[in-house]
Amino acid sequence: IHPNFNPLLKGEGGNPDAILNDLMDSYPKACGVRSHSLTQNGWLLSKFKEIGMLYELNHFLPYYKSLSPFMLWCGLLRIPFNWEDDYHFALDYSFDNCGIELSESTFNIFNFHPIHIYLNSENNNRFLNVKNDMGNIKLLNENRNSGTTKGTRDILLDLLSQCTMQSSKSLKMIDVFKEHANKS
């Protein structure tokens, strides 16, 4: 699930239980969580476990080379991630290279936002142009990066190609959880 606690943090009312219950009603088989803005604290982590989450992905270590999942005190597996599309372009990095080495001996988690894949965003301006009208397909298509400057979609396709060529192992998050649980 991908709860958005930002309205609560802005004082706009609501409560975390209602947000989580609504999501679990819609996605009763969900077993992992990453919050909008990576919002977390001890109470929320315990609440995630209470509603049936097995793992969470709210810990961002940009470009870190030695990722390793670990168990939290509440019984959730924390799976850190080391690359995110909007962070990459916030630093004004080129999408010619993700800045992370892919090899058999490294564990990497890449976070891609679907809207940035669709727009092939190379900067945040593309998203800001459509943010308030994302149901408008014409507007979305007008703001897609189809030029020579590489963007989010391009780097995703490049990573998938590299993984295929190197026969890299890719896993779903539930499989990362199962692998780690079997080691514990």
Task: Write out the residue ranges for each language-model feature.
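Metal-dependent polysaccharide deacetylase catalytic core of the NodB/CE4 family, i.e.
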Residues: 1-46, 110
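Terminal accessory/targeting
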Residues: 21, 25-29, 42-54, 59-184
